Amino acid sequence: MQASQPEVWHGTTILTVRKGGKVVIGGDGQVSIGQTVIKSNAKKVRKLGKGDVIGGFAGATADAFTLFERLESKLEQYPGQLTRAAVELAKDWRTDRYLRRLEAMMLVADKDVSLVLTGTGDVLEPEAGVMAIGSGGNYALSAARALIDSDKDAETIVRRSLDIAADICVYTNRNLTIETLSTD
């Protein structure tokens, strides 16, 4: 790597599962720069707004917190309308000169809907209530899809799937943060 090139930040796996009257978002705690783990217990999943929305992020931490703050502002403008708030955030994210340079992805959920938001303006609802982002996202997604029809509850599926991702992805660890909402 040339000295003029910044190190690439790697890390995280965020997964959401909606099943059995619950929606769960979980994520690992590892943050790496280059080949070095610089933090193992980062909290990348949290409650938003008045606690009726949960979210997780993959990407640059400062960028993600900026986007969480913007989403909370949109949720205040459009209370109880996560999809509308997410679409409005995505519009801003894509068109605002400052925001469009932010490098992060977000998974957010309320009692009715789960969404992934990207800097390219995408607001996507997962198939079968399962979606993942981040470096270990494909591994966690595959594991969760394999487990979704089992008798396991949503939180168990999230925990097991993130453990499987941690077995495979060097940028994912087992220091998990899990948030749950009732969908009833």
UniProtKB/Swiss-Prot annotation:
Annotated GO biological process: proteolysis involved in protein catabolic process
Amino acids binding Na(+): A166, C169, T172
Positions in coiled-coil regions: none
Ways its activity is controlled: Allosterically activated by HslU binding.
Active site: T12
A molecular function (GO) term: threonine-type endopeptidase activity
GO cellular component: HslUV protease complex; proteasome core complex
Swiss-Prot/TrEMBL catalytic activity: ATP-dependent cleavage of peptide bonds with broad specificity
Keywords, comma-separated and alphabetical: Allosteric enzyme, Cytoplasm, Hydrolase, Metal-binding, Protease, Sodium, Threonine protease
Primary location: cytoplasm
Keyword field contains Translocase: no
Compartments in which it is found: Cytoplasm
Entry's EC annotation: 3.4.25.2
Record flagged with keyword Manganese: no
Role description: Protease subunit of a proteasome-like degradation complex believed to be a general protein degrading machinery.
Quaternary structure annotation from Swiss-Prot or TrEMBL: A double ring-shaped homohexamer of HslV is capped on each side by a ring-shaped HslU homohexamer. The assembly of the HslU/HslV complex is dependent on binding of ATP.
Protein name: ATP-dependent protease subunit HslV
